Design a protein with these regions (language model features):
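Conserved acidic carboxylate
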Residues: 8, 55
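Two-component/phosphorelay signaling modules centered on CheY-like receiver
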Residues: 11-29, 69
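Short hydrophobic/Thr-rich beta-strand motif most characteristic of the beta2 strand and flanking loop
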Residues: 25-34, 40
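Acidic catalytic/metal-coordinating carboxylates
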Residues: 33, 59-62
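Short amphipathic alpha-helix used as the core "switch/output" element in two-component signaling
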Residues: 39, 61-72
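His-Asp phosphorelay/catalytic-motif detector in bacterial-type signaling
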Residues: 45-47, 71-75
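Active-site residues of response regulator receiver
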Residues: 52, 80
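Short, conserved "switch-loop" micro-motifs in signal-transduction and mechanochemical regulators
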Residues: 70, 82-83
Length: 83
């Protein structure tokens, strides 16, 4: 089963993404901030990371810079609600 990390600080959007992806058969780990995302990435491998750009304790770009050297095969898709 493919495992997806959802990193989104908007709790409603986080829950909706997680719900729909779970319904489609994916294993989901969902977190609300960059610190918890970094901890999750240290504990296991993910096939995909859905990554919010604006997080309360950092930004998705910086987190992606940490992800790719350690997990080069992990796909990262950025999410944002910015205009």
């Amino acid at each position: 089963m493919k495992h997806i990390l959802v990193v989104e600080d908007d709790s409603f959007l986080n829950k909706m993404l997680s719900y729909n992806l779970t319904a489609d058969g994916y294993e989901i780990t969902s977190v609300l901030n960059a610190r918890t995302a970094a901890e999750a990435l240290r504990s296991r491998e993910f096939d995909l990371v859905l990554l919010d750009i604006n997080l309360p304790d950092g930004n998705g770009y910086d987190l992606c810079k940490l992800i790719k050297p350690e997990h080069p095969d992990t796909i990262v898709i950025f999410l944002t609600a910015n205009d």
